Structure formats: structure tokens, C-alpha cells
Regions:
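Compact, well-ordered interaction domains used in eukaryotic information-processing assemblies
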Residues: 96-97
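Charge-rich, low-hydrophobicity low-complexity segments
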Residues: 1-84, 90-92, 129-178
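Eukaryotic endomembrane contact-site and trafficking scaffolds
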Residues: 88, 108, 112-131, 142
């Protein structure tokens, strides 16, 4: 669509943010949106890097392309929008209304609170530990080429697992977590 193309053009014009240790962003407060590029194209699975987002506040992060794994630690009021993660997305310490939109084979959520919202497409049930006041919804982020990338990553169809999280702090077989 025209809107998606416009968004992609804006994203492409943004400055790439990374450092030498691994693709991602660290120690950022506010400022312009950050773009982290993963592997693109038909062979993305074999070239996909890990991505690390640490100690971020009050910013937007766009993960474009395919990543092998995603590790988020200590994010406050951060919005993360991303394409496919072939393995695990570990989301630890999301606070103050963080919003994460990600498609991943597995998602583990630790110590999320204060209105964190997770928009997920996963091939397994999300694991939740030591978290409260967290909302879940289906993955909705789009950009041109994302559909093909999701198919190649085995995440093309939404299995609905975003609504079936296992809260390890609430082991009750007959009642959903509060």
C-alpha cells in the first residue's frame, strides 16, 4: 500500500544505530527513531544476526529484516517494531508502557509491568514470569517484504498463540492468570 511504502521510505532514511559488539542499541534516551537492520532476502536465515536492545528510554526502535535472536533488557516507554526472529525473543524489564511488536519462534517475558503491551506472532506459547499489568494482542506491524520474510521464517500464519501465554507465576490448570 502507499502508506506502507511511505513508512518504509521514512525508515530507510533513518540513521542505522548499532555498535561493534552486536547489532542493536544501548544506553539511548529519547531522540530520533532508531533503525537496526538484520538480514534481508532469500538467504536471510543463514545470515541473520542476534539483536540486543539494552537500557533504552523514551524512543522508537524499528528492527528491519530477519534476526536470529532478540534480547531486550531494561526498556522504559520504548516502542519496538520488528520483523521475524528465527529463535527466541527475550523481553526483560519492560516498564512505563513499553510496546513491543515482534514475530518470533519463541517469546519469554520477565519482569514486565506498568502497562507493557506485547503484539506477538509466535510459533509457541509465550512464557511469562514475574510480570504484571501486561497486555497481549496479535502482531500488526507491516512493511513491504515483511510477509515474504515471515513465510521464510516459518511465521507466516498467525497461530493465535499470543493469547495463550503460560504465566509461570500462576500455575493453575483451571483458571487463567489475572
Amino acid at each position: 500500500s502507499a502508506a506502507a511504502s511511505s513508512v518504509l521510505a521514512k525508515i530507510a532514511a533513518m540513521e542505522l544505530h548499532a555498535d561493534a559488539s552486536a547489532p542493536g542499541a544501548r544506553d539511548v534516551v529519547g531522540g530520533d527513531p532508531l533503525v537496526v537492520r538484520g538480514a534481508l532476502g532469500a538467504d536471510a536465515a543463514s545470515a541473520a544476526p542476534d539483536c540486543v536492545l539494552e537500557r533504552l528510554a523514551d524512543c522508537d526502535v524499528f528492527l528491519i529484516g530477519t534476526f536470529r535472536a532478540l534480547r531486550c533488557h531494561d526498556l522504559a516507554n520504548v516502542r519496538v517494531f520488528g520483523g521475524p526472529v528465527l529463535g527466541s525473543a527475550l523481553l526483560h524489564g519492560l516498564t512505563r508502557g513499553c510496546r513491543v511488536e515482534i514475530a518470533a519462534a519463541q517469546c519469554r517475558v520477565h519482569d514486565a509491568r506498568d502497562g507493557a503491551a506485547l503484539y506477538l506472532r509466535t510459533s509457541s506459547r509465550p512464557i511469562i514470569e514475574h510480570s504484571s499489568d501486561v497486555a497481549f494482542a496479535p502482531f500488526a506491524f507491516e512493511y513491504p517484504g515483511l510477509g515474504d520474510a515471515l513465510e521464510r521464517a516459518g511465521l507466516g500464519a498467525d497461530a493465535g498463540t499470543w493469547r495463550e501465554g503460560d504465566d509461570f507465576g500462576w500455575i493453575k490448570t483451571h483458571r487463567a492468570s489475572p
